[in-house]
Amino acid sequence: MAKRLWYASCITFAHRLISRSFPALTLYLVGLDAGDIIYIHAFGNSVIILNSAKAADDLLDKRGAIYSSRPIRTMIHDVMRWNWSFAGMPYGNSWRKHRGVFQKHFHIRATPRYEPIQIREAHALLRNLLRSPENYYHHLRRNSAALVMKISYGHDVAEEGDVFVTLAERAMSNVMKAGIFGTYLVDYIPMLKHVPHWFPGAGFKRQGREWMKDSRAMLDKPYEVVKEQMDSGTAGPSVMTIELENSNGSKDVDITTIKNIAAISYAAGADTTVSTMMVFFLGMMIHPEYQRKAQEEVDRVVGPDRLPDFSDRDQLPYVNNIVWECLRWNPIVPLGVPHATIQDDVYEGYWIPKGTTIIPNIWAMFRDETKYPDAFAFKPERFEDEKKNMELGNNDLPHIVFGFGRRVCPGRWLALDSLWITIASVLSVYTVSKPKDANGAVIEPEIEFTSAAVSRPKTFKCSVVPRSEAALALIKQTEDERELAK
């Protein structure tokens, strides 16, 4: 590890560095010269960027007792009032309480109960792609939102979408714009949150006030629907109904905690899996050879007469590799979710003060050529020979995409299951390819990614067509599920 810390004390320079078009890349390039640890100091705020998996493991995992808190992001926490999200709560009793309730429903032994819902929603996606393949992005958003709405609230989202899909998309879009630390000056100077919204230069307050409305609506509206259904006896099983029923007369869980738990699964699940599915569509479009290999595997294992289900998972290793490579190639949260130190520490001879914001540059970690040879390429086969990878110490499965230590994403098992069944289902009946213009010429995609806190490929056109008449018949057979769900 380099013994020199790269240091920026100028607020203007630091702000530009963090807010640049794709900050994870910028910080990766700085790290090539400066080393694995980059230190930025601005208006009394200490920020450390970790560009290597080793540094992240040493600090965020092995020293979790010190590095498991979260910094208060003033724009998000105080101005936009996203203080209900336990993902951003400081380490402490409130966070433990929220995480304990959440984990009860989403730990690795709990998620198999959601497999029927995941299969049903994967099939709904297949039908939607058949009706309007050009709207694939909308269908992916609806698919992700529908899954978490059913699990969290017992609400069935119509195949064309509904108000809750739109609400989640709008609210998450807002928080992603504000999600990169330093995008707003108030993150550096928290006292600015007290500036009146009408004051010159207080546009962030006016913007935050509008965004807060979407945040509150996402928190309150689904809850109100569930309460009405419970009162009328029409509510189906869900995280919300289970917790509300269990909370009657209990002092251990309050209504606010229940609302927060359901809303964070709704918020996170509705946005993160769609980002990885966009990477999948892009990867298959630009690498048809990988798509064909995966389709051949599905055909061999599943056959032509049915769609994949979870019993096929262990027999479809190449499909698994594609899921992992989608997560590695463009990690959902390139700069991770920031940690914060709760006491002073020393690492590799460097003093790290209490209250330092620690940003794990996951994108940079996945571009480490010593760990991921040909790291910038989309190559699912890098995960094929697990024994060889272990011997060479490279191509680790990218579990760190879900975070580190005590703050690792507790919904990761549901996310992995959802990605797998959706990707396997699409591969079984569709071919994703480059589109053609009116003259029949192939349209080459521009491979660009958004720079928000949750990153996805910038919207691109693609062709999504059934692989065969047999595949088309399988898609149409799922219409029976739609009728049963009504």
Each model region followed by its residue ranges:
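Cytochrome P450 heme-binding "Cys pocket" and the immediately downstream C-terminal segment
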Residues: 68, 288-290, 412-459, 465, ...
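Short, cationic low-complexity segments
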Residues: 477-486
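Cytochrome P450 heme-thiolate monooxygenase catalytic core
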Residues: 71-79, 112-278, 293
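Cytochrome P450 heme-thiolate "Cys pocket" and heme-binding signature region
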Residues: 263, 268, 385-419, 445-450
